[in-house]
Swiss-Prot record:
One of its GO terms (cellular component) is cytoplasm. Pfam families: RNA_pol_Rpb5_C. InterPro entries: Arch_Rpo5/euc_Rpb5, RNA_pol_subH/Rpb5_C, RNA_pol_subH/Rpb5_CS, RPB5-like_sf. GO terms for molecular function: DNA binding; DNA-directed RNA polymerase activity. It catalyses: RNA(n) + a ribonucleoside 5'-triphosphate = RNA(n+1) + diphosphate. This is DNA-directed RNA polymerase subunit Rpo5. The gene is rpo5. Belongs to the archaeal Rpo5/eukaryotic RPB5 RNA polymerase subunit family.
Protein backbone atom coordinates (compact mmCIF):
# COMPACT_ATOMS: atom_id res chain seq x y z
CA UNK A 1 0.00 0.00 0.00
CA UNK A 2 1.27 3.46 -0.86
CA UNK A 3 2.00 5.85 1.96
CA UNK A 4 0.98 9.48 1.90
CA UNK A 5 3.88 11.79 1.00
CA UNK A 6 4.45 14.79 3.23
CA UNK A 7 4.50 18.14 1.46
CA UNK A 8 5.42 21.48 3.02
CA UNK A 9 2.66 23.70 1.65
CA UNK A 10 4.53 26.85 2.71
CA UNK A 11 7.52 25.93 0.53
CA UNK A 12 5.43 26.58 -2.59
CA UNK A 13 6.06 30.00 -4.16
CA UNK A 14 2.35 30.80 -4.55
CA UNK A 15 1.42 30.15 -0.91
CA UNK A 16 1.80 33.31 1.20
CA UNK A 17 3.27 33.32 4.70
CA UNK A 18 0.71 32.52 7.46
CA UNK A 19 0.94 32.79 11.24
CA UNK A 20 -1.46 32.50 14.17
CA UNK A 21 -1.94 35.72 16.14
CA UNK A 22 -1.69 35.64 19.92
CA UNK A 23 -4.71 36.69 22.01
CA UNK A 24 -3.03 40.03 22.71
CA UNK A 25 -2.33 40.64 19.01
CA UNK A 26 -5.93 39.72 18.14
CA UNK A 27 -7.29 42.21 20.71
CA UNK A 28 -5.02 44.94 19.29
CA UNK A 29 -6.11 44.14 15.72
CA UNK A 30 -9.79 44.39 16.63
CA UNK A 31 -9.20 47.62 18.56
CA UNK A 32 -7.14 49.19 15.77
CA UNK A 33 -9.78 48.54 13.11
CA UNK A 34 -12.73 49.01 15.51
CA UNK A 35 -14.35 45.74 14.51
CA UNK A 36 -15.79 42.63 16.15
CA UNK A 37 -14.12 39.26 15.58
CA UNK A 38 -17.20 38.13 13.62
CA UNK A 39 -16.50 40.86 11.04
CA UNK A 40 -13.21 39.29 9.95
CA UNK A 41 -13.15 37.30 6.71
CA UNK A 42 -13.27 33.57 7.40
CA UNK A 43 -11.11 30.60 6.48
CA UNK A 44 -12.22 27.00 7.00
CA UNK A 45 -10.41 24.76 9.47
CA UNK A 46 -9.93 22.23 6.64
CA UNK A 47 -7.89 24.67 4.52
CA UNK A 48 -4.47 23.06 3.89
CA UNK A 49 -2.59 26.06 5.32
CA UNK A 50 -4.72 26.02 8.48
CA UNK A 51 -4.15 22.29 8.93
CA UNK A 52 -0.39 22.71 8.40
CA UNK A 53 -0.24 25.46 11.05
CA UNK A 54 -2.34 23.51 13.52
CA UNK A 55 -4.80 26.39 13.92
CA UNK A 56 -8.19 25.71 15.46
CA UNK A 57 -11.60 27.42 15.13
CA UNK A 58 -11.50 30.80 16.83
CA UNK A 59 -7.85 31.49 15.96
CA UNK A 60 -7.00 34.53 13.84
CA UNK A 61 -4.41 34.15 11.09
CA UNK A 62 -2.20 36.90 9.71
CA UNK A 63 -1.36 36.32 6.06
CA UNK A 64 1.53 38.22 4.46
CA UNK A 65 1.14 38.60 0.70
CA UNK A 66 3.47 40.10 -1.85
CA UNK A 67 2.38 43.29 -3.60
CA UNK A 68 3.93 44.90 -6.66
CA UNK A 69 3.21 48.38 -5.33
CA UNK A 70 3.47 48.05 -1.54
CA UNK A 71 6.08 45.31 -1.23
CA UNK A 72 3.98 43.32 1.23
CA UNK A 73 0.54 43.66 2.72
CA UNK A 74 -1.19 41.81 5.52
CA UNK A 75 -4.69 40.48 5.79
CA UNK A 76 -6.45 38.56 8.50
CA UNK A 77 -8.77 35.56 8.60
CA UNK A 78 -10.83 33.98 11.37
CA UNK A 79 -10.60 30.17 11.43
CA UNK A 80 -14.09 28.62 11.44
CA UNK A 81 -15.41 25.06 11.50
CA UNK A 82 -16.32 23.43 8.18
Amino acid sequence: MATKKEFDIFAHELVPEHRILSEEETKELLRRYRIQISQLPQIKASDPAVVALGAKPGDVLEIKRKSRTAGYYYYYRLVVED
